[in-house]
Amino acid sequence: MFNKLFNLLTGTKKEKNPADSSRTDMPLSRDLQRQFVRSYIEQTASEREGGIPNGVYETSIVSFVFNHEKIEGSSLTEWQTRTVFETRDTVLADSTTPGNVRETANHTKMFDFLFDSLDRELTPEFIKEIHLQLMAGVMDVPGQWKILGNGVGSVITARPEEVPSLIDRLVTEYNKYEPSLENIVRFHVRFETIHPFPDGNGRVGRAIAFRECLRAGLIPFIVTDASKETYYASLDEFRAGTTTSLISYAEAMQVDFVTTIAPMLADRSLSDSLLGKLGIERPNFKDDAGFVGPSTKSLKSSLESVENSGSEIKSDHKTLRTRRI
C-alpha cells in the first residue's frame, strides 16, 4: 500500500503553494521523515493485522484518540481509552458517561479508517465519510453538512448554505499544490473556520491533518490536551495573519510523535538515526529495576532548534517550548 501511495503522490508534479514560506524549525529532513512514515505505516499495518499489543499501533491510536477526545471535554482517562481500544466495546462498567465511550469507540474505528484510505485523495465526500465514522450513533445525521448556524467562540463561521461551495473550493485549492506541512496547517485553519458540521469539526479537522501528513510523507502530529491552549491561541494568530506560531507548534508536535514512536520501530538503524538527529538517547533497561525513562535528555533540549519566545507546551513526560509571535 505504501508504494502505491507514494507512486500516486510523486506521479504527478504539483506546483508549490506560493503562500508557503521557506522557513522551518524541523530538525529532520524530508527524506528522513519519509523513511519514518514508510516504516511507521508498514509496522502499524503489521501490528494491527497480527493483533500485536503495546507497539506503535496501540501507542499512537490511544494517544490520538485520548488527546483529541479530551480536548473536546471527554471525561475518559487514558486507561479507559486504552480499554475501549482493546475491547472495541461501547460500554465501560466504571464509566458514567456512555456518550463519551461511544464517541471514543467510534474514534478508534475512524483512526483505522484513515489508514485504510491513505490512497484516496481528499474530497468533500471523503470528509463526510470521516465524520460518519466518528459520529455514527451519536448524531441523528452523521456525515452531513450543518443545516443550522454554529460558532466557535468569537470566530464567525460559515453559514449553512455556504458550506458546500466553500468546502469544494478549499479542497480543490488544497489538492492543487504539492503537499507541505504549511499547506496542511493552512487547510486545517480554514476548515475549522468554516466549521461545516454541527459537531465534531475539531476532531475531523485534526484527523485530516494527521492523515494528510502521512500521505505527504511528513511526520504526523497529535494535538495534545496538555498543549491545547497554545494550539487554540496559535489558531487565532493564524487567522489574524501570523502563521509562524501554529506551524512551529505543529513541528514541535511532530518531534514529540517521533520521540514516542521511534524507539519502538523495528528498523533499529532508522530509529537510531531519528533519535540521533534529535539528540535523544535511546531508552535503556536495568536488570534490577526494569525500564528507565525515555531518555536522559528531555525533549526540551532536543528542540533547541525550535526558536521560542516564551510559550510552553506541557506533555505527559516532557516540556516543550515553541515560538509564540
Q: Each PLM stretch: what is its role?
A:
Residues 1-199, 203-325:
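FIC/Doc superfamily catalytic core
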